[in-house]
Amino acid sequence: MINAVGGNIPGATIGDDQSIFDNKIQDTIKAIELNLYGTIIPTLIFGELIAEKGKGSIINISSLAASRPLTRVLGYTVAKHGIDGFTKWMSTELALRYGDQVRVNAIAPGVFLTEQNRTLLTNEDGSYTDRAQKFINGTPYRRLGDPSELEGTLIYLLSDASAFVSGEVVFVDGGFNSWCGV
């Protein structure tokens, strides 16, 4: 099962001309609910079916934001931290109760240009925004990811090739999380 519920809420994004204290708390709560509960609830529902079957793999979608906090998106960052902790907890809980054939992992994508974040990362003329350029400059690959580049990791984590892998958060980010910038 790939659990890919999530995203951000426009009102939960702190504008360039705002401070953290201008944050709309209700929208931040909605972003946390969307991402964290949007992961926990389906994992519990489908996880029970997988556990009863005695074999399966659950993959939650985390984010580089859980490891390297992103500015302007408080609720999203907090929720992704929660997803990492929940993934580790759930993997342990299922393994201890149902054995080593039930696995839970997460992938933490770096910055991928998608329809969901296009307005945040590109200008109207198609050029990159300053924010996108900061991500590119902080990534050893010097580019944004293509969503198709997540497929290999997803296939691996769903397959028997990862039979001894559980409770892990795998970064797919062009080296962003690993690089200090020098």
Question: Where does each model-flagged region fall?
Answer:
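Conserved mid-core segment of classical short-chain dehydrogenase/reductases
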Residues: 7-29, 52, 72-75
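Catalytic Tyr-X3-Lys loop
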Residues: 21-40, 55, 59, 83-84, ...
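Active-site helix of classical SDR
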Residues: 43, 79, 87
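Residue(s) in the substrate-gating loop at a strand-loop-helix junction
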Residues: 63
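Short, small/polar-rich loop/turn modules that mediate ligand/substrate recognition or access, typified
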Residues: 98, 103, 165-167
